Amino acid sequence: MGELRGAHVPVLLERCLELLSPALDRTGQTGRTVYVDATLGLGGHAEAILTAHPRTMLVGLDRDTEALAHARVRLARFADRVHLEHAVYDELPDVLDRIGHPVVDGILFDLGVSSLQLDAPDRGFAYAQDAPLDMRMDQSRGVTAEEVVNSYSHPELARVLRVYGEEKFASRIASAIVRERDRAPITSSAQLAELVRQAIPAPARRTGGHPAKRTFQALRIEVNRELAALETALPAALDRLAIEGRMVVLSYHSLEDRLTKVALADRVRSKGPIDLPVELPGTGPTFRLLSRGAELPGEAEVAVNPRAASVRLRAAERLDPTQQQRQRTDRERYRRQVRAMHQPGTGSAVRRPVSGDDGTGTDEEGEGHDD
């Protein structure tokens, strides 16, 4: 286990605690709640949750064995409430079934590359450091970035850079990679970063940060199958939340945030026919959004933790179906009273019953209202 460089600052820690705490404060019949950190990393968020909620049990997942080792040390004082697993987040349902916690109360996804991985000089994630082209979050399995850049065809490389890096010079960069590897294999992050810099037109290099940023992001996503795993993991995680359970997702680029937005929007919309006067049982929203769109970090957060600059937070809570049914009944009773009022010979005033704001209203983009 390598030494950590600098202090680890969990991103949007106070906001995550604020959003997850209502779900973790409910102990129910078992006398405890279960919190899943699907991307445990160095355990900063988990430590804060366990400290604030002494009746909460942690299930922590991470594909990086080095991160798990650091987190195990950090969380040692909570050992009787901690269960750590070497797993990717799309394996969450299998993990929960195996350990006997099929339903949980809170889930956090803190996506992207971790501080440990960025700072480790031998992992190859950072374009500012010279290191072997590895980029695997789990160094025990999978292909490396070196294998990708030296074996993928030009069309395959261009697709990866264009789709996962949103790189507009994808084809030019892919051509430069193919030309260079024909002379000698590309083996280091510094070699690749310089190759990308030279492939991008000079005017474009002067804006948008380091020229290799998008290429390194794209290769990392390809190597670790990040988006494919996330697309599977988000709906599966929502399915495992208890009533009034909550999930928070921190994403760091538009592709992650888009998948999160789609997964949540699917659960906060009615599935019933739009032309029916009433909502059919089982077709209403099953979740409500806890944030208005994607929340951004404040200036103070970014000043303390510059790596939080690109974060986008989204959160949702599972609704109680019995409460939803009561609200549907109230709405139907009101409609009947209105119809009766407009019948010949009636003239009594109708007062609409007051129903609680369930926060399920969304626009076409899937955005909701503040909690």
Curated annotation (Swiss-Prot):
Question: In which domain of life is the source organism classified?
Answer: Bacteria
Q: What is the first-listed, main subcellular location in coarse terms? A: cytoplasm
- Give the compositionally biased regions (Acidic residues): 360-371
What is an example of a GO molecular function annotated in this UniProt entry? rRNA (cytosine-N4-)-methyltransferase activity
What the protein does?
Specifically methylates the N4 position of cytidine in position 1402 (C1402) of 16S rRNA.
Q: What is its EC number?
A: 2.1.1.199
GO CC entries: cytoplasm
Stated name of the protein: Ribosomal RNA small subunit methyltransferase H
GO BP terms, alphabetized: rRNA base methylation
